[in-house]
Amino acid sequence: MGKVGTEATLLKIYDKVNNIEAYTDILANGWTTHDWHGLKRLVEDGVAQHEYPVGSRITETWAKDANTNISAPWDVVHYDEGGNMFLKWHYAIPDGMPFDAPEAIWYADAENLLTAGTYNIAIGSAYGNGWVVGQAIQFTLTEDLVEGDQIFINCGTDYNINPTNNRAWNVYAQGSTTSKQSGTTTNGTDGTNLGTIGNVSAQRTNGLLNAISRVVYGSGRWSESAIRQYLNSTSEAGAWWIPKNGWDRPPAQAATMRGFLGGCSEDFLNIIEEVPVVTALNTVEGFTDTTETTYDKIFLPSLQEMYINPQLAGVEGEDWDYYKDLAEEAGLTGKFTQGGTYPILITYQAGSTTSPVTVWLRSAYRGYAYNAWYVNFTGNVLSYYAYYAFRGCPACKILAS
């Protein structure tokens, strides 16, 4: 990666920062910015932003798999007041990854183990043309459930599909894609009622039933997202995804894609650390807090960080200077706006750098349980269903101390 520090370069840095301690430390111990350890030293010594100002690009190679290496440069996008460096991939990951997969409708905990028999779930909220108040989803289990079993109904990622009309259902163990039993649904109230499912009542406010929208489209919550797990794992395909709630289901890509960090160099992995990442929660699921904090080595940018008007200001990180500069270059007098189209925000795919792609942000669309924000292949800032396999631009924070 990058440059090699010479004494002349060091003298220029010293002249800019007037930091004799950092200068003499670097001269004594040496550094090269062709490795990540050298870059980390620059950040720790407080001189990185002079050698690598915002807008600089750090060359790097990423291994998509054992046989495919891809050019994957990092952009320097921001420094905070503490001198921490923020980096973001210039290109998007080469393959699509859902923000989150459609979830199970019901799961069994230790106190609620269903025996073989007929059950029904009343529909309490209209949703699209498919979910009709007054109908009930009826199905018959042929075997007893054990703790952790999930009942998953294939709703076709379409709220206009009626879940009572001959829809396939399966019982899975948490994290498994192997069906333990299966059948099809009917509209009826025979057997035992498991409760009434609503559109936004999840997070155990409605027993063990999920929210309708999350059953159809998945969840827009960053902390529980599949893409967050993918970005923060070194594990091979089939080993990086674990359920984050009782209803959580793996995306198909979990079985075929290696964790993102598994393609990064050992030098890079040795200098990144988990950092607190704050993300706003949606307003429809009854959370007591407006935000939550995760601890991530890799994260996706938020609306705020990309200098886009956020739904909840001042919580999802700082305005990154890189995007402030892009807004100025685009002739804006303020921030990019939700719903606006900005060609300057178009992202191209790593390994195919003439192909514009749509990239997820980590910000939830706060008015729904199942949406997250993205910037599409035309530069349009929008939100969409979590199940969709968009790309993303990994970001990280190199700590100054």
Regions found by a protein language model. Give the residues of each.
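Intrinsically disordered, low-complexity regions of eukaryotic proteins
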Residues: 9, 111-113, 151, 160
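Short, low-complexity N-terminal tether/leader segments at secretion or assembly junctions of large
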Residues: 1-17
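Autoprocessing Asn-cyclization modules and mimics
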Residues: 104-147
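Collagenous Gly-X-Y triple-helix signature in extracellular proteins
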Residues: 16-107, 146, 154-401
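Intrinsic-disorder/low-complexity peptide segments enriched for small residues
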Residues: 8-9, 37, 112, 139, ...
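Terminal low-complexity, poorly structured segments
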Residues: 6-7, 23, 109-110, 117-119, ...
